[in-house]
Amino acid sequence: MKKNKGIVVLLLTAIITVFLCYTAGIGLGPTGTGSAKNIKTGLDLSGGVSITYQAKESNPSAEDMSDTVYKLQKRVEQYSTEAQVYKEGSDRIAVEIPGVTDADAILNDLGKPGSLCFITMTDDDGNANFSSTGSGYVLARSLDEIRESGSVVLEGTDVKDAQGGAFQSDKNSSREYAVSLTLTDEGKTKFADATEANVGKQIAIVYDNQILSAPKVNEAITGGQAQITGMSSVEEAQNLASYIRIGSLSIELEELRSSVVAAQLGEEAISTSVMAGLIGLVIVIIFMIIMYRLPGVVAGVALILYTAIVLITLNAFDITLTLPGIAGIILGIGMAVDANVIIYARIQEEIASGNSVRASIKSGFSKAFSAIFDGNITTLIASLVLMWLGSGTVKGFAYTLALGIVVSMFTALVVSRFVMNALYAVGFHDEKFYGRAKQRKVFNVVGKRKVFFIISIILILSGPVAMAIHHNVDGTALNYALDFSGGTATTVTFNEDMDIKQIDSEVTPVVEEVTGDKNVQPTKVVGTNQVVIKTRTLSQEEREKLDNALVEKFNVDDSLITTESISSTVSSEMRRDAVIAVIIATICMLLYIWFRFKDIRFATSAVVALMHDVLVVLGFYVIARVSVGNTFIACMLTIVGYSINGTIVIFDRIREALATKSRTEDLKDLVNRCITQTLTRTLYTNITTFIMVVVLYILGVSSIKEFAAPLMVGIVCGAYTSVCITGALWYVMKTKIGAKAATVSNGTKAIADTKKAEQVDSSEAPADGNTAKSGKKKGKKKSFKDKKKKNK
């Protein structure tokens, strides 16, 4: 790069950085477009809308209520991945949607959960079930009569999903609008029989005795997927899909009440989190400058750009930010720092080996690429799986994590490279600006592996032992929060309006004293004097004590205090989704590492190290009695990301060293050397991330502290695992386990026995390296087509 070009690059970088920071901080135009203040936040940070539904039928079954909660959860995720749906009492369902303030608009858009069915034009005797009015369709007789005649071919519960959207017509390349239906296994069979018998006829979709649409059957639909075509606009398609989804609930619901609720953590939660983030970021940048000099300045610019881009993107894509979302951003900052540390440590190593500064910069970026790429792609794969299969908190975390990974790779591999080369081009040639790696004494980690393994076993077993003790003493192994265990909701109408800060300081202590619950969750109903206080499940005696305490302390009217049992906001189905998502994500990471490193032992060691960190942090939750709720899921997923990233950095060094290994070098010495070479990266990355979390812990509100404390333990544990466990574990697997098995690596053969494995040849080293369309125009009749058959 020429000097003039370098000056241009630096000027452009400065201008873009200032512009992005201004956009993220203040925003553009009168509405502040792009500003962080416009980011949609969750119920915990900014409040939202609360809607309570009542089941129409008396005494609905627990199974139907659970199924309805799960389906409603999926339904409201279109507004926010952080929306919460839970059971209230035996026949009510509460829906809480963050970031919105108009309850009526949500109710209109969400639709009234009623009955849905699909009916044929006529019954077997030829009696008409519905007729056209010119502008629509009406039932020709009562729905009860239609049911008795056997004309109902599908019920709402036979519909698995419905999505409205646009597609390109095959016939004339015009834009068409349709609703895509996915049926259950039972619905697939029913609809196949019905459409086969009614080709050329209409099947009407009836919602609460009103005909929404009456598409014509073009062909037998046997694949369980269909499209309703002929819509005049995408809004019409989405509206019909919305009615079908809400009508597919297991039970009919009616709105009982709706309200706007304030932030659960209060406004100070956002301000303290922002302040903690800024302070932490400044400390991290100063640390990087002290450790890496000029490259540290470049890292600071990259981190500032990372933060600004993430905030702007969160705003642009309307992603809801909650505590778990903040976890994803913190993990992203850690990975952004990690990428820069890997690069700059490599540059200093190259300078120490006698290369010129220019050659060292080029070689540093080149050699660091594989570790950065593999570490980030592995975590990105996990986040995409969690995004795909997860729900609620898991999905929200996955969105912010995926965003952070993509942005961190861009700032480290693109921005940092351009700025570093530009600085060199304008005259920063002296190695004193970059530093030189110090020669470290090689640590005999592998030789002391038994000691480290024993320490790890003790740490891992401490969790189950503590769980058993608490289970016998308290009856619960873990200190479950309301998110997981459910509890009691007490609604109180006070004599005066109280803000959340006043509620926390005056009301919450009274509730904690009476109930002994340290995880009280008060929520203010905006525009009223009402406060909803959620606690653990209270007995009738405890409820009466709480009522008396509130009356005595605040002189409230006893008749204005109501209590209701509530279910967990994380339903069993959501927990199932989370577990399945994590298992599949882990398998995908294992397969990717196996593919990239050409040795299953690398992948197996990485997963074992991952489980080690998760179990140690779980032990901390048990011993410290930290409440297990939504933030628990986010914390564990963050630990998984850190663990796998740190492991891959060391394995990348081992892979590189194996490619140039001499026949005389002992494998144990090679692993020890690689661990020592990556020690700087491990320490610096964990220190910088630890700083961010410590500041968050010091300045944050109580809920944030409960999230930050286990995360700090996880970071420390991750550093220990990276240095003391991963390399030694791979060495054991390489030399003791499967030494006689074939190794997947460029057609080479595995070592026949343990002794030969100690002198593995370098040649064994792994290489581095659906829709069917109707084509109908506006005004024409709608029709059913087999989506699955068309895709084939």
Predicted feature residues:
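A structural signal for conserved, well-ordered secondary-structure elements
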Residues: 1-792
